[in-house]
Amino acid sequence: ILPSGDLTNFGFAMRDKGLSQGWRGEKLDLVPLDQPEAAPVGTLERALYRPLGAQTSAVHLAGRIRNPRDEGDPVFLLGKRSSRKLVGPGLWDGLAAGMIQAGETPLEALARESQEEAGLTAFDPVKAEFLACDRISRPVRGGWMHEVSCAYAALLPEGFMPEPVDGEVDHFECVSAEEALNRIEENLMMKEAAMTLLLSIRKLL
């Protein structure tokens, strides 16, 4: 285990040199890249992970509205990301998504993000359908993204429409599977949200 004080001082030094992506005051578990399933060796400020190429973990939720008139024509909920977002401003996202914070389980993160971004106060993450966990590795602005992305799907009541809560989502829309696929094809959707949506659609086939 790395001393928390050393990691904190290291983080402040990176920030003071302008090497961090802002500063969020949010800690994530730090795990070795070559041992992604190992216990965390410490925690580090979220804004340092991409510049360092350190591994993060995230959850993504695809929301589908029940359509009793035509179960073969699914309706999905997409959120328009705020123009103020550092990553993917203005792109389309799933119902909820976010980093797994230090000490959280994926389901705990799913419940928190669902409430923070979409106001789902009564959402039970245990009822969400697990789709897959994938490892992502690609260059991003200001660094490198190494991430374990956990995808889930949830069926929501007919007529349900979430309300943006924390300002990270501009608004939500209900779209057909065809329209969602069009937005993916036109590169209007976040890559991880697109992957989650495609997995959800495939489950329905």
Each model region followed by its residue ranges:
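N-terminal leader/linker segments that precede catalytic domains of diphosphate-processing enzymes
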Residues: 1-91, 98-116, 120-161, 177-186, ...
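Short glycine-enriched loop/turn motifs at secondary-structure junctions
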Residues: 164-168
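Short aromatic/basic micro-patch
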Residues: 174
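Anionic ligand-binding catalytic core segments
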Residues: 192
